A protein has these predicted regions:
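Hydrophobic alpha-helical transmembrane segments
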Residues: 1-115, 124-335, 339-444
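Short, acidic/turn-prone active-site loops that include or flank metal/cofactor-
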Residues: 118
Length: 444
């Protein structure tokens, strides 16, 4: 008989094998993960493992989560062969954080999360506590095997930050398996933290200190005005304030101005043709007022890039990512909203079939043109502000187009099945735009 408690205990106990990452080479560890995948697929169902296989998986004929777990571990090892401490920490968050959240949520979860009633505050806190502790331990345990050894601040701070980020991602109401989203998020945060250097911080400390005061004042005023003007909800006000402070403190008024332009683009285009959108049932919720999830999905990566520009030695790449993320997000919003308001025929990029406006992933000629022009305008403003050289504008626009294509394809295929939601798609969109823009700049 299936037992969720037994499943989670096994899920958590598998983290003991992460201890081996201190003594194994990356290829030895990869072989072990591959062997675990074969074991879970072939041996486990025949060796009494049905007690930890959910009924839905049993009826399907294969245990999805139990197979994805070793695949995620294998990918972590392959992604960070020289930094197995990152793989071990992310593994600890996957095993202990995710497992503790389920057990605590089932046992003590009484306070539901506002954005996902299926998750609880107690479960989230258990995730962060257990996952953070496990990640710090594994980072410390594997540190002697890393050359050069990571700094103590990284061993302590980065895993905790990764646990918080992964815990929040785990609460997003989507069908994407936690065994994918949790380790991917944790590993991304740990990798970004590994790029931070004391030298970069020291070189920008004076400018950051000078920007903090104005950042607090300007963003408090802007966030309050946005809420009073009913352009954002309370969650959007708070998230926008935090993102704005990070961007202003890191990049000054030039970076913040570009962020504000992106927000203005989203606000204005959301209100264009609002009556028509409402009649068709495709208007943004609450009259286009942006929430916290929308704010982070569209501009969160830009805030991360802004911080990376002053905390890592990769300032140029970070600035390209910053401008590209905003241009991609702003252009995508313009494409979506103008397409729904004034677009003609709309088509799915995956099948070329004509569909009604507002269908996930659907594109129109008018919307696509508006998106490209919006991305071009934001990229050009980024160049005028001195954030990127003018010749990089085309790379940013190309990245924005690539992001839009990827988002449309994923929206048409994965969003209807709730594997991802609109906020996740928007974040993927901005990430794709930033990555493609950086790649183009590097090979140009």
């Amino acid at each position: 008989m299936f037992s969720e408690t037994a499943r989670q205990i096994v899920h958590m106990s598998m983290s003991v094998f992460a201890l081996l990452l201190r003594v194994l080479t990356w290829w030895q560890a990869a072989l072990c993960a591959a062997a675990a995948l074969v074991f879970n697929a072939v041996v486990l169902p025949r060796a009494g493992g049905r007690a930890i296989i959910r009924p839905a998986d049993a009826s399907r004929g294969y245990p999805v989560g139990i197979l994805i777990y070793p695949v995620s571990v294998l990918l972590l090892i392959l992604a960070f062969p020289e930094r197995l401490d990152i793989a071990a920490s992310a593994w600890g968050i996957l095993a202990l954080g995710d497992g503790a959240a389920t057990l605590a949520g089932r046992r003590w979860g009484r306070h539901r999360l506002a954005w996902n009633p299926d998750k609880s505050v107690e479960g989230l806190l258990a995730f962060i506590t257990a996952g953070g502790a496990a990640a710090v331990f594994f980072a410390w345990w594997t540190a002697p095997a890393i050359t050069p050894p990571p700094a103590t601040t990284f061993i302590i701070a980065a895993p905790i930050l990764a646990a918080v980020a992964a815990g929040l991602v785990e609460t997003i109401p989507i069908a994407l398996d936690d065994n994918i989203s949790v380790p991917a998020t944790a590993a991304a945060v740990l990798w970004l933290c590994s790029l931070v250097t004391a030298g970069a911080w020291a070189g920008n400390a004076e400018a950051i200190a000078a920007n903090v005061g104005p950042a607090l004042v300007v963003n408090t005023a802007a966030a309050t005005a946005g809420w009073l003007l009913r352009t954002v909800r309370v969650s959007g006000m708070l998230a926008g304030w935090a993102i704005g402070v990070v961007v202003f403190a890191s990049l000054g008024v030039q970076g913040w101005g570009l962020l504000f332009l992106t927000f203005l683009t989203a606000t204005v285009t959301s209100r264009l043709g609002l009556k028509k959108k409402a009649l068709l049932g495709i208007a943004e919720e609450r009259g286009g007022r942006r929430g916290g999830g929308n704010a982070f999905a569209n501009t969160g990566l830009a805030a991360i890039a802004a911080a990376a520009a002053v905390a890592t030695p990769f300032r140029e790449a970070a600035l390209v990512a910053f401008v590209a993320a905003l241009a991609t997000g702003g252009g995508d919003t313009a494409a979506s909203e103008i397409g729904k308001a004034w677009g003609g025929k709309t088509y799915l990029p995956t099948t070329a079939a004509e569909v009604r406006p507002g269908t996930p992933g659907a594109v129109s000629l008018e919307g696509s043109a508006a998106g490209i022009l919006g991305a071009l305008a934001i990229a050009a403003c980024g160049a005028l502000a001195g954030l990127i050289p003018p010749w990089m504008v085309w790379a940013v626009v190309a990245g924005a187009i690539a992001g839009s294509i990827v988002e449309s394809a994923l929206a048409a295929t994965l969003e209807p099945a709730r594997v991802v939601n609109n906020d996740v798609l928007n974040f993927i969109n901005t990430a794709t735009g930033a990555i493609v823009a950086i790649a183009i700049v590097r090979i140009s």
